[in-house]
Each structure stands twice: as structure tokens, then as C-alpha cells.
């Protein structure tokens, strides 16, 4: 009987209830709200779902996650394993044809990165360090894996807040972008019908990822793992002889890695790291970054329209953020409302895929400038 009493006492002593805090309760509630948004409202469910459940798990006291599979999942983020693997799958799903057919749209992808640097400046004004500000600013690129990659490098203590902000705003692109697009364009500009893109050869599609990898990696070696895997996945897609590798990359592999990446990100959302004024500031700055990126792309689109004699519809500039293909679809929807005969989707895919490269380049630039400071 005494042994039984000791066993019961041991269970009670080791119970998480005794170590459960108000902070844990708040964060579990946050996780449940995110689960609701992910599954009931379909806000990036493939990503916010695992992030939210990881948040719940992280706030169970005495969970023993320092060992076992959860420790390995966390290591996959801290050792920068998962983001490049996600990029491999993204590359296998990406068609760079619209960008190759209209290379000037690369400039729109670059212009949309202005939101990154606007948020960076705002974060520094609010008292964040340069490294923290850079990690926050990259939210404006609308690229979750790159946001996680840069946060892991420069501000790992802010990873959870940055990831939640990035994926939340990515899911809200159809709500955030249209008002900004309409604010900076006229009805006449939104009605512009663009010429059909030329056909891109298979040779061009194979050469592009190779040349891009070599040139950009030599310029910014710190992003070679991200960019290299992106372009390798694209080579699987375009080579015509590696269909099995392409299929695995864009289906089984990316789905599996997404589970681990998102869950591991959620595991960083413990009460002591997440419950702070900084988190609220990060969420606000993320919105500023998204709006700034959209505005930057549209305004540069207006400039291109002036230079080429009215051939460019400025709406495609908003697709310069790298939320692929959601941002391009928003350009199509807004353009079709202005002119039902307008079809901007393929034109918008050029700056959209350019935004993927642009965000990686922006991250590499900030890494080169700040990683040793």
C-alpha cells in the first residue's frame, strides 16, 4: 500500500499541472485560435495547422522535448535542414517561363522587396537590433521558408512570432493587396491588356536555373543552400528525364518536410519567448512590410508603364511578393474586375516567381551585412 502511495505521489509530482503557468494557458489558447483559423477558416491550413499544434505542445510543462523525435525536429530548423528542402519542392513546382519570356519583370520582383527594407527601418526605430530588424523585415517578402531561414540565422528567439506573422499575412494576401493596388492605380491603368508572352524553349528553361545559381551564389554565397535547392528542383521539372524526382520533390517530399518545419516552428512558441510586446510589434511590422512590398511593386509597374508607352499593366507589380501563385491570382482578379476581357495571370507569374528569387537575394544581402556583427 505504501508503494502505491509513493507511486501516486510520484505521478502528481511529475505532473505538468504543478508547473502549469498563466503564460502556458494563454499560449495554448493562442494555439487553439490558430488551429481554428487554419482548419475552420482555411488560413494557410497546411502550415498554420502544424504550427498551432506545435505551439500547444510547446506549452505543456515537463514535456521532455529535449530528447527524442521532437529534439530532432527542432534540430532540423536550427541546423537549417528543412527550409532548403522546402525550396527543392518549390522549385519543382515553379515555372520560370513567364519570367524568361519577359525578363524585365525581374525588376518588379526586386521592387516589391522595398517592403522588406521599410519594415527593417521601422523595426530599428522601435528599438530592435539590426539582426532582429532584418529577420522581421523579411516577412514582407511573403516567403515563409526564407523568413524561417533568416530568423534562425539572425534572431532565433523571434522565430515563432516571425513565422506566425509571415504565414498569417500570406493567407490574407487576397484581402491585403487589392485596396493597395486600387489606391495606387487608375481605372484606365487597371484596364490595360498586355500582349501575349512568347513561347519559351526547353533549352532556355534548363539554362536559366543553372546560370542563375552560379551567378547569384557567387554574389551572395550565404544563400547558396536555398537558391541551389530551388534551382535543382526546377531542373528536375524542366529536364524532361527526371519525372520521378520532380514528382517526389513537389509532392511526397515537400509535404513531409512541411509537417516537420511547421511543427518545429510551433515548438519555439513557448510562453517565455512569445508573450511579449515584441510579438505585437512584429505582427504590426509584418503588415507594414506586406503593404510596402505591394505598393513598391505597383509603383514600379507604373514606372514601367510610362517607359514602355503603356504596354505594362501596373497591377502585375503587386505579384512581386513571393506568395506563389496567390499574389499572381490577385492581380488577375483585380484586373478582370476592371476589364472582364483582361487575362493577367501569366504576365503576373513573371514578377511572382521573380519575387521568390528577390526575397532570397534580400535575405542573402542582409546575412552578408549582419551575420558577423
Protein language model annotation of sequence segments:
Residues 6-19, 37-41, 53-81, 235-256, ...:
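Hydrophobic transmembrane alpha-helices of multi-pass solute/ion transporters
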Residues 16-27, 71-86, 132-140, 167, ...:
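Structural signature of hydrophobic alpha-helical transmembrane segments
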Residues 39-48, 67-73, 93-108, 242-251, ...:
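Interfacial helix-loop-helix linkers and transmembrane-helix boundary segments
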Residues 75, 79-80, 87-93, 108-118, ...:
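Alpha-helical membrane segments and immediately flanking helix-loop junctions
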Residues 99-120, 270-297, 348-352:
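Entry/N-cap segments of selected transmembrane alpha helices
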Residues 157-175, 285-293, 316-319:
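Alpha-helical transmembrane segments
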Residues 168-241:
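Membrane-embedded hairpin module used as a gating/binding unit in multi-pass transport
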Residues 213-300:
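Transmembrane helical segments that form the transport core of multi-pass membrane transport proteins
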